[in-house]
Amino acid sequence: MRVDLFDFELPTESIALRPAVPRESARLLQVTSQEMDDYHVADLPNLLQEGDLLIFNDTRVIPAYLEGKKNQARISANMIKREGLRQWQAFVRNAKRLKSDDIVDFGQDVSARVVHRNDDGSVLFEFLGNEPVEILLERAGNMPLPPYIAHKRPADQQDRQDYQTIFAEKEGAVAAPTASLHFTEELLQRLEEKGVKHTKVTLHVGAGTFLPMKVEDSDDHVMHSEWGQISAETANAINETKKQGGRVIATGTTSLRLIESAADETGLVHPFSDETDIFITPGYRFRVIDGLMTNFHLPKSTLFMLVSALMGREKMLAAYQHAIDTGYRFYSYGDSSLLLPK
């Protein structure tokens, strides 16, 4: 499928650099097969039904962005994937200045050795010392903000709170499951009072979620893989909801992709603990998901193709144009949408 069919023009001023405060005050565009309506995330208890099941991703973002020096050369590195007890792959600015066995000093008594530089420009680092790498990153790292924010401003202490969901428990993500950023404990309580239940899965979001498709046809795109887990308890909750006639609504594309990866052809969800590289494009038959809450995505991205698969390309292009025209804020810190195909 031609990637340029999923392109649209987005004004720079539509990109949110900070989240809405309070979180649930973000705007929410509800899109159904019949219409589009403007709400706020705080309206969710009135938009969802008793018996619905929301799925949240409980991954925790690690402070994976590091700035350091090799001699006098400034080096910035985004850790993207763990490769061993002390080794991480990283996207590196000024990677050409690095060679095998170079030592990069990231400050705060944190340094790493260059194992090798990969053909794609990424670098494999091995962190020195005996302290767990998680402690080193917590001490010296910053939140790995998406490129479209990081190019406008550096990460700061506020991002350590803003770029983490209230469900964050299991460390491993280098990007936030951003649809869940809109939820507060108070909103969850109101949803529970309405009879809307929720459960959690884990998918450690990788930096590949921000990579543009560099091909003209989606058939030629190599999808990044991410590790995810669905417990037997969560699988049972999803299957029971479907059995009782309730709707399963994924909060975020990460939850959706994981659930669809764990479902068999009959729509039954099984416990899951593995990598997934599922790539959902128009024509895909959804096995489980009845709806999706998700932020607004980049043009020509795998995630815009995913929402187009759920709702239809023309409808999503029209919805995004409405969002742009009426001042919705886009991307990770932006507003959200509730997509209900039936």
From Swiss-Prot:
This protein's record includes keyword Cytoplasm: yes
Entry keywords, A to Z: Cytoplasm, Queuosine biosynthesis, S-adenosyl-L-methionine, Transferase
Alphabetical list of Pfam families matching this protein: Queuosine_synth
Superkingdom per UniProt: Bacteria
Pathway the protein contributes to: tRNA modification; tRNA-queuosine biosynthesis
InterPro entries listed in its UniProt record: QueA, QueA_dom1, QueA_dom2, QueA_sf
Catalytic reaction annotation: 7-aminomethyl-7-carbaguanosine(34) in tRNA + S-adenosyl-L-methionine = epoxyqueuosine(34) in tRNA + adenine + L-methionine + 2 H(+)
Annotated GO biological process: queuosine biosynthetic process; tRNA wobble guanine modification
Keyword S-adenosyl-L-methionine: yes
Compartments it resides in: Cytoplasm
GO molecular function per UniProt: S-adenosylmethionine:tRNA ribosyltransferase-isomerase activity
EC top class named in words: transferase
GO CC annotations on file: cytoplasm
EC number: 2.4.99.17
Stated family: Belongs to the QueA family.
Oligomer status and interactors: Monomer.
Function description: Transfers and isomerizes the ribose moiety from AdoMet to the 7-aminomethyl group of 7-deazaguanine (preQ1-tRNA) to give epoxyqueuosine (oQ-tRNA).
UniProt name for this protein: S-adenosylmethionine:tRNA ribosyltransferase-isomerase
